[in-house]
Amino acid sequence: MILDTLENLGNYVSLNPLFSQVVDYIKMTDLASQPEGKVVIDGEKLFVNYCVAKGKTKEEAKLESHDKMIDIQIPISSTEVMGYTPRNVLPVNDYDYEKDLTFYDGLADQYITVHPGMFAIFFPQDGHAPCISENSEIRKVIFKVEN
């Protein structure tokens, strides 16, 4: 898991060959003005979801992980808290191959605060519980990057 500001995202391009395309896309795009929906950047290897999510309490937020994709999550409209638990301490649960998604019961071990202008990267080894906020809605951008 990585937490940093958007201006530093370029420092992480060596971690995945597709990260440089994410940096280029962000430089060319006003993320805040995009409508909800999916934008394909490089087939199913790299795409971005623009979404408005319902704000949740820590108890409502579900821990999740992905096997095939890395999440780069960027809050746009408001601060978002995200739970984190290393996947190796989570129980083995059913994996949805079609959605590349595993859910887990219980609360996260730790919580990070991600402000607009920041990002959080969650790798397959990172259990994460997004969308924790006192706001009823969170506008956010999620880049899905093939691992």
How would you name each of these model-derived features?
Residues 82-83, 112, 127-134:
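Short beta-strand His + acidic residue motifs that chelate non-heme Fe in jelly-roll/DSBH
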Residues 119-121, 136-147:
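A short hydrophobic beta-strand segment most commonly corresponding to one strand
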Residues 12-28, 96-103, 116, 146:
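Compositionally biased, non-globular sequence tracts
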Residues 68-70, 74-82, 88-90, 97-102:
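Glycine- and acidic-residue-biased ligand/ion/polar-headgroup-sensing regions
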Residues 113-127:
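Conserved metal-binding segment of the jelly-roll/cupin
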Residues 1-40:
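Long, hydrophobic N-terminal alpha-helical segment
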Residues 38-57, 63, 67-76:
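A short glycine-rich, His/Asp/Glu-containing loop-to-beta-strand
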